Amino acid sequence: MEEILKSFKISIDNEGYSKSFSLEDLDNFNNNNNNNNNNNNNEENNPYEFFERYGFLVIRNVISEEDCNKTVGEIFDIIESKVKTFDRNDQSTWDQTFSEDGSSIPQYGSPSKPPIFKKQFLMNRTNPNVYKVFSKLLKNQDLMVNHDRACFFRPTLVNPKWKTNDNVHLDMNPYNWMGNGDICREELSKLTYARLGEFIVENNQPTQNDGLQLQGVINLLDNQELDGGYCVTPGFHTIFNEYFTSKKPQYTSPSWNFDKKDIAFKYAKRISMRKGSIVVWNQQMPHGSMSNKSFNPRMAQFIKIFPTSTVNSVRYQHRKNQIKSIIENSDELKDFPLNQISSQLLGLN
């Protein structure tokens, strides 16, 4: 297994960013796995063959610069609302960035532990380009979007104490995923969304019976390798079953963390991306983040889009009621533009 992971190399373009594709590339090629002939030249040009082989895909220019800037502003709004001494324009005030009341996750750079419901965050979740990326890879247009967190990595060359924890993990229990799905369905059936944290819980209950499941990160600033951020273990999806059948099963945790000595951690690669890019990966892929080692901050929004067919009618209604209530009771969301795509993705149909 180690030799397989060791064989994967990620090319870097002439601006120092990891291999990426355009939205047009998604249209210019067909997503037909039967045409995969393992030709490395095709993988470099065809986004679907690249995704099939590597297990992840970077698409550039998905979110506009203006929308990225608005999202960055909303992240700073969250921080400044919690930490009164923090000033986004003065790095000397960044020593205390994360609130001490348990509503942040400082070790991973998350200013908000609950999912974020701000206008631009919802605009990004329902952005037609984002929807296009997921629908093309899933070969499915009947999709819904999750509600997740964001991250802010401070520049550690300004202050080494701002370092976040390196981590590689799965947002699922691999043994429940490989099972018949009963455990996952039971957990999902308990969700009423009375607590906002239940929107996070739903992310971690995929099953192989649901087919391909995708996660993503929307990159909000130019992000070079030393700026820290997203990492993934290319090709791991090809050895997923073999790897976990060689381990002692454990069914209780909703996620799986890899030790630094593990091959999944050892062969994880930092994926550098331009502002406005999105990286999407097969949920079977070990992924996580590496800490910042530069003068530049990192900001990103987390996202998952999944087939509506994986949500039963009772849970759909609970979810719909909560989303509708959140929008109607928020001054900044009352005028949120609902159309065919956004209503479908938010589960408001």
Swiss-Prot record:
Superkingdom of origin: Eukaryota
Gene3D superfamilies noted in UniProt: q2cbj1_9rhob like domain (2.60.120.620)
Keyword Metal-binding recorded: yes
Function in brief: Converts phytanoyl-CoA to 2-hydroxyphytanoyl-CoA.
Alphabetical GO biological process terms: fatty acid metabolic process
Binding residues annotated for Fe cation, in chain numbering: H169, D171
Binding locations of 2-oxoglutarate: K118, H169, L170, D171
Pfam family, one: PhyH
UniProt keyword list: Dioxygenase, Iron, Metal-binding, Oxidoreductase
Enzyme superclass (EC): oxidoreductase
Residue intervals passing through the bilayer: none
Functional pathway: Lipid metabolism; fatty acid metabolism
Cofactor: Fe cation; L-ascorbate
Protein name as it appears in the record: Putative phytanoyl-CoA dioxygenase
Family: Belongs to the PhyH family.
E.C. number(s) listed in UniProt: 1.14.11.18
Keyword ATP-binding on entry: no
